């Protein structure tokens, strides 16, 4: 549906620009003998999780980052998972890493995430780093919110002074995005809505920018969007036919000024900023 009226916020092209920059920075680190390494911890054989992890390592190869994979069987104990996390925390080759979610039900996700060394938290979702974001202290930033801000800037969508309506209160997007957008460097005004918000269209029609991250198929429709507004589609869910769809309905393209496609919008940037967090930490370690 792109090209009907709205300008496409192209996440793939923007990711490619970031990768060109990262490749140069990784080459400079490698010359100093400090090649960054990204680790992944994958438990079990969920096809979606396997695909995500494969994608992350393929991205690493494109920019010259070393891959460190820890693939574990689905029936491991919490103690065995903890031991793997401790090993990566201590491993000097591993600059940063992620524990791929969801974990099997018998494992404690929050305990696993809290065990990650906050300095090696490539996702930017460790409680310490989310706390630093609240305090406006330097820390690895959550990848999806950072990707959203970068994508808006790349296409010169005005953020300072803008009213942004975020739909979704999850820890990976909705909550931290509000914190990023209200920093002095962004200066947006944020309204945080969710699936239980009453009269949601009243909020969205007032918005300069809408970020849909609720995981409800096509919940944002054309009549909810002010003409010319920017609409970012982060939601991922399946429709009745099992097809992956976003939170933004196709008719929004006819009304909005900018729309991020889904797939091909924010997703590629989430992966790009995962690598950026790792490269930035390698550079900080190199500076001493």
Swiss-Prot record:
<keyword id="KW-0560">Oxidoreductase</keyword>
<keyword id="KW-0511">Multifunctional enzyme</keyword>
<dbReference type="GO" id="GO:0009086">
    <property type="term" value="P:methionine biosynthetic process"/>
</dbReference>
<dbReference type="GO" id="GO:0035999">
    <property type="term" value="P:tetrahydrofolate interconversion"/>
</dbReference>
<keyword id="KW-0658">Purine biosynthesis</keyword>
<dbReference type="InterPro" id="IPR046346">
    <property type="entry name" value="Aminoacid_DH-like_N_sf"/>
</dbReference>
<dbReference type="InterPro" id="IPR020631">
    <property type="entry name" value="THF_DH/CycHdrlase_NAD-bd_dom"/>
</dbReference>
<dbReference type="GO" id="GO:0005829">
    <property type="term" value="C:cytosol"/>
</dbReference>
<comment type="pathway">
    <text>One-carbon metabolism; tetrahydrofolate interconversion.</text>
</comment>
<dbReference type="GO" id="GO:0006164">
    <property type="term" value="P:purine nucleotide biosynthetic process"/>
</dbReference>
<comment type="subunit">
    <text>Homodimer.</text>
</comment>
<feature type="binding site">
    <location>
        <begin position="168"/>
        <end position="170"/>
    </location>
    <ligand>
        <name>NADP(+)</name>
    </ligand>
</feature>
<protein>
    <recommendedName>
        <fullName>Bifunctional protein FolD</fullName>
        <ecNumber>1.5.1.5</ecNumber>
        <ecNumber>3.5.4.9</ecNumber>
    </recommendedName>
</protein>
<comment type="similarity">
    <text>Belongs to the tetrahydrofolate dehydrogenase/cyclohydrolase family.</text>
</comment>
<keyword id="KW-0378">Hydrolase</keyword>
<comment type="function">
    <text>Catalyzes the oxidation of 5,10-methylenetetrahydrofolate to 5,10-methenyltetrahydrofolate and then the hydrolysis of 5,10-methenyltetrahydrofolate to 10-formyltetrahydrofolate.</text>
</comment>
<keyword id="KW-0368">Histidine biosynthesis</keyword>
<keyword id="KW-0554">One-carbon metabolism</keyword>
<feature type="binding site">
    <location>
        <position position="236"/>
    </location>
    <ligand>
        <name>NADP(+)</name>
    </ligand>
</feature>
<dbReference type="InterPro" id="IPR000672">
    <property type="entry name" value="THF_DH/CycHdrlase"/>
</dbReference>
<dbReference type="Pfam" id="PF02882">
    <property type="entry name" value="THF_DHG_CYH_C"/>
</dbReference>
<dbReference type="GO" id="GO:0004488">
    <property type="term" value="F:methylenetetrahydrofolate dehydrogenase (NADP+) activity"/>
</dbReference>
<keyword id="KW-0028">Amino-acid biosynthesis</keyword>
<dbReference type="Pfam" id="PF00763">
    <property type="entry name" value="THF_DHG_CYH"/>
</dbReference>
<keyword id="KW-0486">Methionine biosynthesis</keyword>
<dbReference type="InterPro" id="IPR020630">
    <property type="entry name" value="THF_DH/CycHdrlase_cat_dom"/>
</dbReference>
<dbReference type="GO" id="GO:0004477">
    <property type="term" value="F:methenyltetrahydrofolate cyclohydrolase activity"/>
</dbReference>
<dbReference type="InterPro" id="IPR036291">
    <property type="entry name" value="NAD(P)-bd_dom_sf"/>
</dbReference>
<dbReference type="GO" id="GO:0000105">
    <property type="term" value="P:L-histidine biosynthetic process"/>
</dbReference>
<feature type="binding site">
    <location>
        <position position="195"/>
    </location>
    <ligand>
        <name>NADP(+)</name>
    </ligand>
</feature>
<keyword id="KW-0521">NADP</keyword>
């Amino acid at each position: 549906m792109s090209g009907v009226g709205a300008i496409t916020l192209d996440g793939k092209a923007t990711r490619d620009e970031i990768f060109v920059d990262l490749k140069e920075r990784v080459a400079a680190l490698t010359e100093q003998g400090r090649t960054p390494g990204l680790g992944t911890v994958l438990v079990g054989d969920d096809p979606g999780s396997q695909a995500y992890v494969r994608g992350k390592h393929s991205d690493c190869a494109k920019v010259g980052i070393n891959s460190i994979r820890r693939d574990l069987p689905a029936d491991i104990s919490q103690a065995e998972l903890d031991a793997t996390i401790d090993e990566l925390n201590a491993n000097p080759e591993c600059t940063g890493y992620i524990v791929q979610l969801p974990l099997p039900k018998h494992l404690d996700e929050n305990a696993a995430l809290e065990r990650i060394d906050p300095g090696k938290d490539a996702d930017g979702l460790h409680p310490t780093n989310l706390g630093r974001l609240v305090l406006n202290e330097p820390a690895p930033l959550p990848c999806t919110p950072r990707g959203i801000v970068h994508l808006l800037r790349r296409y010169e969508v005005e953020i300072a002074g803008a009213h942004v309506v975020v739909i979704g209160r999850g820890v990976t997007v909705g909550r931290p995005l509000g914190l990023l957008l209200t920093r002095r460097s962004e200066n947006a005004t944020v309204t945080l809505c969710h699936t239980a918000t009453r009269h949601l269209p009243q909020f969205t029609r007032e918005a300069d920018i809408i970020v849909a991250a609720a995981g409800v198929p096509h919940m944002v429709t054309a009549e909810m969007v002010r003409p010319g507004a920017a609409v970012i589609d982060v939601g991922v869910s399946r429709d009745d036919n099992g097809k992956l769809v976003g939170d933004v309905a196709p008719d929004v393209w006819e009304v909005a000024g900018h729309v991020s496609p889904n797939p091909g919008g924010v997703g590629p940037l989430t992966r790009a900023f995962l690598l950026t967090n790792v490269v930035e930490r390698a550079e900080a370690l190199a500076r001493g």
